[in-house]
């Protein structure tokens, strides 16, 4: 609930035209073994972003960047994501740039290839 609470409280302090960028991962769309709870949370955040974007005022935007397994973490996490194609960190960074500097709201910015 940390990211949700950040938006719930932060919207009262964010300047008009500001934005929130939340973070999730590939598990919302492509869960793997033993990830039921994380997959559920990722999917819930996706739905929260879509709904909250309809209710935020003063031009405040909200998006979520959802990343696949990042190349930098392959050594540590590859066993948990069999058959997944690692994503270059630059691609993930560009997702955040798109969210912060773009004009979209309510977007799930998926930064992963077809697993």
Where are these regions (language model features)?
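Catalytic loop of short-chain dehydrogenase/reductase
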Residues: 1-6, 11-57, 66-69
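C-terminal helical subdomain
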Residues: 57-60, 64, 70-115
């Amino acid at each position: 609930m940390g990211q949700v609470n950040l938006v719930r409280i932060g919207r009262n302090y964010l300047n008009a035209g500001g934005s929130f960028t939340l973070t999730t991962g590939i598990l919302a769309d492509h869960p793997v073994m033993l990830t039921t709870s994380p997959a559920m949370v990722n999917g819930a955040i996706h739905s929260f972003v879509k709904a909250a974007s309809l209710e935020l005022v003063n031009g405040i935007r909200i998006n979520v960047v959802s990343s696949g397994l990042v190349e930098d973490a392959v050594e540590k996490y590859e066993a948990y994501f069999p058959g997944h194609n690692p994503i270059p960190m630059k691609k993930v960074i560009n997702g955040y740039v798109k969210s912060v500097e773009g004009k979209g709201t309510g977007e799930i910015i998926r930064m992963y290839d077809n697993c």
